[in-house]
Amino acid sequence: MEGIDLGNAFAQSLSGLGVPADVARALWLPLPMIVILLTVTVGVIAAVWGERKWSGMMQQRMGPTIIGLGGSIQGAADGVKLLVKEDIIPVKADPWLFTLGPAIVIIPVFFSYLVIPFGQGLVLSDITIGIFFIIAVASISPIGALMAGYASNNKYALLGGLRAAAQSISYEIPLALSVLAIVMMSSSLSTVDIVEQQETLGLFSFFSWNIWRQPIGFVIFLISALAETERAPFDLPEAESELVAGHHTEYTGMKFALFYLSEYANLILASLIASVLFLGGWSFIVPLEPLAALFGIEASNPIFQVVNALVGISVTILKATFFVFLAILARWTLPRVRIDQLLDLGWKFLLPVSLFNLLLTAALVLLSNTLKTTLPLYLPLIIFVGLVFVAMSLQKRPAAKPTAARA
């Protein structure tokens, strides 16, 4: 099923009301970014509340409880607080670069949401190079972080900016290679096509999700995405014990809020991309269309289309929430790594493994096309399970302490 062109649908709806076609298309232009801005802002508020609550549960405390029902609008209150705080620019800072830094960090994140499908036919822009667009746009944000660190005229901020740039470059390559393996299997760069490729087994589409075909790529993507979003244990650019607050040490007010917003917007974006690439996007464990066909319900039924759209949106959000929870869990269970360990992990381990995974995927796709079956694509799952089993078998167990002899 092809995605709906929301732009043309919007223009046709207004044209039916007597609005000129050119005016209707002009009215559509700002709407996608407005929708994204509102959606991401609400998502960030929910993510901040969820992280504070889950963090409180892990530490056996309550978390926010005062502002709103159960502290649900604590994030919005913090945003208003930052909005009205004084905007200070250090005397010796470069005012132009200091101001542009936060904007260059946050703007590419919003553009990336344009190609994320939230449901079947619910994507603002289904361009044929969607995944390539996300990777290309995401590479702009480190420039803003480096610019902010340099313009602050602060040694800690500069070191934070340099760390952010080095970390981003180190992990963009393994992340891109893990995504490229998915692209090879689906033969498309479109995010919608990648999701639809994971629905090829009808009622058993759960087993066609890419997580079963690309377990190695999935682990590489998770680690790389965590590093790209600068979340613990990879929060080296703003390590409080070393760099105060990294490249946003000198920022206050709304400029600081933009950095804060970009961190959680990046986390949500990475979670959505992971759900689209590896967990079937809007696909439920049992797809609704084949299930409805068993009961004689046609896919063109308006009620079914509404239910299918709502289920798709809910499933996408739930899958993304699962990845956000994993990121929060990693923050409170794993210690922060050193900068040399971070770079070694990216260049000496993830990069070779991602290259191996890409070459293996290419060979299996060729074999699958030759044999006219998708069974060879599940070989990485067997390899991954075998490696996990070997690693667990070789794990050193502490020697038992000798029991003291009784007198």
Swiss-Prot record:
GO BP: aerobic respiration; photosynthesis, light reaction
Swiss-Prot/TrEMBL keywords: Cell inner membrane, Cell membrane, Membrane, NAD, NADP, Plastoquinone, Quinone, Translocase, Transmembrane, Transmembrane helix
Catalytic activity: a plastoquinone + NADH + (n+1) H(+)(in) = a plastoquinol + NAD(+) + n H(+)(out); a plastoquinone + NADPH + (n+1) H(+)(in) = a plastoquinol + NADP(+) + n H(+)(out)
GO MF annotations in UniProt: oxidoreductase activity, acting on NAD(P)H, quinone or similar compound as acceptor; quinone binding
Compartments where found: Cell inner membrane
Residue stretches spanning the membrane: 28-48, 96-116, 127-147, 175-195, 203-223, 267-287, 309-329, 347-367, 374-394
Membrane topology, from the record: Multi-pass membrane protein
E.C. designation(s): 7.1.1.-
Record's GO cellular component terms: plasma membrane
Family: Belongs to the complex I subunit 1 family.
Job description of the protein: NDH-1 shuttles electrons from an unknown electron donor, via FMN and iron-sulfur (Fe-S) centers, to quinones in the respiratory and/or the photosynthetic chain. The immediate electron acceptor for the enzyme in this species is believed to be plastoquinone. Couples the redox reaction to proton translocation, and thus conserves the redox energy in a proton gradient.
Quaternary structure, from the entry: NDH-1 is composed of at least 11 different subunits.
UniProt cross-references to NCBIfam families, sorted A to Z: PRK06076.1-2 (NF004741), PRK06076.1-5 (NF004744)
Name of this protein: NAD(P)H-quinone oxidoreductase subunit 1
Record organism: Gloeobacter violaceus (strain ATCC 29082 / PCC 7421)
